[in-house]
């Protein structure tokens, strides 16, 4: 085999390995991109303290769709709340395992309209981690959030 053929084989192997690495890394990189920019309605998470409250009141509606294969009851305690930009709010979701087995689930959250997602900041949320409910367990799960004051501009 000539040196040129060996170099071509090495190059092809390098390209294939690079493509595999890119495929493997694309999902976490896209997730990071969405969290940083708020792209596609993905909310940003933060630990920032409250700033001076805005005067505008915003109505936030909560939804709880569930995968048909997940044997849970899952719903927000209140269907909506009002919040002023910069004001931190705490709301709760309720979940109940309807089976006699341990069942785990993880919330996928989104904000619509999508252009508002970058202003919706979750401080703490059950949706950051997988939730496991024991047989027939009922639980209350908190969500703490605020709307960035930049939204009113």
Curated annotation (Swiss-Prot):
HAMAP family: CtaG
Membrane-side (Cytoplasmic) residue stretches: 1-8
Chain coiled-coil ranges: none
Membrane topology value: Single-pass type II membrane protein
Pfam families tied to this protein: CtaG_Cox11
Topology feature Periplasmic, residues: 30-153
Similarity annotation: Belongs to the COX11/CtaG family.
Transmembrane segments: 9-29
This protein's record includes keyword Cell membrane: yes
Protein name: Cytochrome c oxidase assembly protein CtaG
GO cellular component term of the entry, any: plasma membrane
Keyword terms: Cell inner membrane, Cell membrane, Copper, Membrane, Signal-anchor, Transmembrane, Transmembrane helix
Any one GO molecular-function label of the UniProt entry: copper ion binding
GO biological process: respiratory chain complex IV assembly
Gene label: ctaG
Its biological purpose: Exerts its effect at some terminal stage of cytochrome c oxidase synthesis, probably by being involved in the insertion of the copper B into subunit I.
Cellular compartments annotated: Cell inner membrane
Principal location class: membrane
Species for this entry: Ehrlichia ruminantium
InterPro entries, A to Z: CtaG/Cox11_dom_sf, Cyt_c_oxidase_assmbl_CtaG
Source taxon at top rank: Bacteria
Cross-referenced PANTHER family: CYTOCHROME C OXIDASE ASSEMBLY PROTEIN COX11, MITOCHONDRIAL-RELATED (PTHR21320:SF3), CYTOCHROME C OXIDASE ASSEMBLY PROTEIN COX11-RELATED (PTHR21320)
